[in-house]
Amino acid sequence: MITAPNYSILKQYIIEELAPFWQKKEGVLALPIPAVPWPKAEPLPPRVKIVALPSWASDIGVNGNILVPEQFSDNADASALWATTDWFSTLFWYLNGIPERIFELNHGPIHSYSYRLAGWDQRLWEHAWVNRIAKFLRRWASMEAQGTEAEVCGSLPKTSILLTHDLDATK
């Protein structure tokens, strides 16, 4: 079992990790995002659901939607799920691969191979969910502040691609 950090630490971690999306972080920090308690155990395979974004942010999602872990979104009216989802916990969950870590604690390493996670929802790996959520939070902050995203959060980072190579150590 992996225990989630204190919520204020979790939130600060997310703000720092995704700082390129909000050079000005105050607008995102002020969003009325609920802090949903973490479950005592992570369900495996993870249970996920689609959250429809509001019309003013539908271009950010995949067909206007974001895939989130069920435990961080209540069972409110489907059109209001975006406002009752714990986006900071969702980001932490994705960034840290929480379900994969739990699986590895119980079954050994998967070495980032999703095929070893039989029965898991493949949509988890089909889109850049963290980036989409960060862009959604930028848009939401600008709506709340009645300004542009650039005014409220700063400019988006220039796109860059980093090529890396995964090295495995052996004796």
Features from the language model and the residues they span:
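Terminal accessory/targeting
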Residues: 1-171
